[in-house]
Amino acid sequence: MTDHDNQRWLQLWRERRTDFHQHGVNLLLSRFWPAFAPATPSRVFVPLCGKSLDMLWLAEQGHDVIGVELSPLAIEAFFRENHLPPSKRRQGRFTLWRHGRIGILCGDYFALSEADLGPVDSVYDRAALTALPPILRSRYVAQLRRIVPDTARVFLLTLEDAEADATLQQALGVDEELAALYTAGFEIALAHVESLFEPDPQNGAPRRVEHKVYQLTGKRPASPEADGRAAETED
């Protein structure tokens, strides 16, 4: 993120303006993850994790969880509030906080390398993408493609404003911005849509929003051999 965005995020945690934090496990995660997850425990990456309780739930399912979070206050609060005494050590440009199956790298997501992150089987994104300014979202997706293997799958939860004039097909379809961001690198499956009226965070007035569950599967890059065979076929 830009230095301005980083400072704003750190300030939110210093001033405890964290209304975005959910005080329980996300119900869509507990409902749809079991069908998405590998049959055996895996390593799950949680970008921009804050102090999300979803990490506890994932660890309770037997997964190893690795998050990344810019604010040390958020990380400290996660371990303190859940009575988990962490160990801390340097890992590249990051500090790794760990207790049991849960580790959180303290630092900038955009500075994360594949070596810093380590092996990943799945990615859990609950509104990390949509929390970013639109100008940064393509960078977020490009960075994800750089640091996770092509075989990793993404469990993506989004909160989208419902368009008043949207057709039913549009409301129940893949968001246009999301399709533009992910189609080049992932196969996109929309698993669930839930339309609700919720208070507008700006003025409290009711607004209709759509909670969507996406399951993304990485596209493997074409090998040089495959490209050569395709060219021979065309000839």
Swiss-Prot record:
Matching NCBIfam families: PRK13255.1 (NF009732)
Protein's name according to its UniProt entry: Thiopurine S-methyltransferase
Listed Gene3D superfamilies: Vaccinia Virus protein VP39
Sorted UniProt keywords: Cytoplasm, Methyltransferase, S-adenosyl-L-methionine, Transferase
Matches recorded under InterPro entries: SAM-dependent_MTases_sf (IPR029063), Thiopurine_S-MeTrfase (IPR025835), TPMT (IPR008854)
Chain spans, region Disordered: 199-235
Record-listed S-adenosyl-L-methionine binding positions: W13, L48, E69, R126
UniProt entry tagged with the keyword Transport: no
Family: Belongs to the class I-like SAM-binding methyltransferase superfamily. TPMT family.
One cellular component (GO) term of this entry: cytoplasm
Signal peptide: none
A biological-process GO annotation: methylation
GO molecular function terms attached to this record: thiopurine S-methyltransferase activity
Catalytic activity, reaction form: S-adenosyl-L-methionine + a thiopurine = S-adenosyl-L-homocysteine + a thiopurine S-methylether
Enzyme Commission (EC) number: 2.1.1.67
Coarse class of the protein's main subcellular location: cytoplasm
Ranges of Basic and acidic residues composition bias in the record: 226-235
Lineage: Bacteria, Pseudomonadati, Pseudomonadota, Gammaproteobacteria, Pseudomonadales
Compartments in which it is found: Cytoplasm
